[in-house]
Structures are given as structure tokens and as C-alpha cells.
């Protein structure tokens, strides 16, 4: 597995469609689709499945400054930095826009205070991208900004949340006067809600690909359906036969849609 990762990294395929100047492979959408098809055909896993590559990186390419791109993107493409997401809070429930973690401007820094919860991998992450409130007087969707926070900063406390299984995939993170450079603001001040929505679009896109790329059994349903139908020819199996054919047709239509998206 290590050799596989190293070879994919050396080919710049950790982020195959990112610009070459930021460590990516420079592939256009059509060539990216070909690469994904070949990985699937060879039953190879995606080289990198993480928040940096699939979610934050595309947002930095769209909203980040040139300095931010140069600082944060190349380490992602080399697999050197781990990221976590600081969105959910203890008192907000599903109303994310009511978040209360504050970021007060002070000189060349923001001073961050508050807490995040259900943060996957925070105990191992190097950095967090966090939604914070930079204008408490503004309407709740308009006073939010997105900051990149170094998890080694003084004032950060990470507490793993032990699940009933004994695992601790999630954490609670506390910020006590954490100083974050102004240069780590992504997008405009108080414009973080729009940036976050864009980031979550990339999350949905990434999740939709995970099963398609990582489950070899789903490489091609058509031959499997044909074998199934050959062995289930009894009239009583008609409903099952129709369902199996519908699944194969849906998968084929999905791949045609991806091909069209690549061409566009």
C-alpha cells in the first residue's frame, strides 16, 4: 500500500485535476474521468480520501488568495497535512447558522473563543477549517466567516468523545482566546456562509464518488445482472428480474451522465 501511495503521489494524482503549480496533476475533466475509470477497472482504491483534497482544496482554488494557495495546497497534494472540519457546535443542533464561536479582530489576528463538537479526527489533525462569528450584530447568516486554524495553537483543547463501541472518532474542541492570523481568512469577512455552502457541495460530490470508486463489486453491474437472469428464469422471478435490470440501467445512465459532465 505504501508503494501505491508513493507512486500516485509522484504522478501528482493525489489531486489529479488541480493545477500543476499547486502540486496537482493538471488533468481536465475528461482525463480525470478516464483515470477514475481505470482505477475502478483495476480495482484500485482512491489514493487520498480526506477533507483537504476533496473539500477544502477546491474551495481554496475558488476563494483563496494566491498566498493561501501556495501555502496550503502543495502539502495537501503530498499527503503531509491532515484537516478536520469545525462546523457543529454543542448548542446549535441542526441550525448551523446560529453558531456562537466568536472571532474578534485584534491587530493582525482574530481571537477565537468557543467550542466545536462531533469533529472527526480533531485529535490527529494538523489544521481545522472553522466557521466562526465575526459580526454578532449582523443577521446570523451574514456574520459568519471561515478561518483556517492551526491545531497546535495555544488555547486549543481537544477532547475525544468515546462512543459505546469504545472508539473515539469524534472530538469536542475548545478555543480559549486562540489567535489566528488574518491571512487565514478564506473569502470575505462575514462571507463565510457562502463559502461553507460551496464546500458542502464538494462534500456531497465526494461522498457520491466514494462508493463508486472504492467498491470493486460495483465496477460493472451488467455482467452480474446477465448471470443472475440466466439462473433466475422462472416466471415467478419477474419482479426481481425487473429490479435487477433497472439497477443496471441506472448505473449505466449514471456513467453516461458523468461522461457528459466531463465533456462539458
Spans of model-derived segments:
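A short, Trp-centered hydrophobic/proline-enriched beta-strand micro-motif
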Residues: 79-87, 131
Amino acid at each position: 500500500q505504501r508503494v501505491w501511495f508513493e507512486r500516485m503521489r509522484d504522478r501528482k494524482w493525489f489531486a489529479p485535476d488541480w493545477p500543476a503549480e499547486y502540486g496537482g496533476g493538471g488533468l481536465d475533466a475528461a482525463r480525470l474521468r478516464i483515470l477514475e475509470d481505470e482505477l475502478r477497472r483495476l480495482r484500485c482504491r482512491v489514493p487520498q480520501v480526506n477533507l483537504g483534497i476533496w473539500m477544502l482544496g477546491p474551495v481554496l482554488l475558488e476563494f483563496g488568495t494566491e498566498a493561501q494557495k501556495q501555502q496550503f495546497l502543495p502539502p495537501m497534494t503530498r499527503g503531509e497535512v491532515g484537516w478536520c472540519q469545525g462546523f457543529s457546535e454543542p448548542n446549535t443542533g441542526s441550525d448551523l447558522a446560529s453558531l456562537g464561536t466568536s472571532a474578534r479582530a485584534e491587530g493582525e489576528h482574530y481571537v477565537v473563543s468557543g467550542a466545536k463538537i462531533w469533529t472527526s479526527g480533531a485529535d490527529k489533525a494538523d489544521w481545522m477549517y472553522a466557521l466562526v462569528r465575526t459580526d454578532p450584530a449582523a443577521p446570523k447568516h451574514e456574520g459568519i466567516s471561515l478561518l483556517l486554524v492551526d491545531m497546535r495553537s495555544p488555547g486549543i483543547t481537544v477532547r475525544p468523545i468515546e462512543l459505546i463501541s469504545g472508539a473515539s472518532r469524534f472530538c469536542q474542541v475548545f478555543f480559549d482566546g486562540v489567535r489566528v492570523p488574518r491571512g487565514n481568512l478564506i473569502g470575505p469577512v462575514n462571507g463565510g456562509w457562502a463559502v461553507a455552502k460551496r464546500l458542502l457541495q464538494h462534500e456531497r460530490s465526494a461522498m457520491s464518488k466514494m462508493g463508486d470508486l472504492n467498491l470493486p463489486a460495483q465496477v460493472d453491474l451488467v455482467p452480474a445482472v446477465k448471470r443472475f437472469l440466466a439462473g433466475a428464469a422462472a416466471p415467478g422471478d419477474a419482479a426481481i428480474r425487473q429490479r435487477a435490470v433497472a439497477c443496471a440501467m441506472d448505473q449505466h445512465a449514471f456513467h453516461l451522465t458523468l461522461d457528459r459532465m466531463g465533456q462539458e
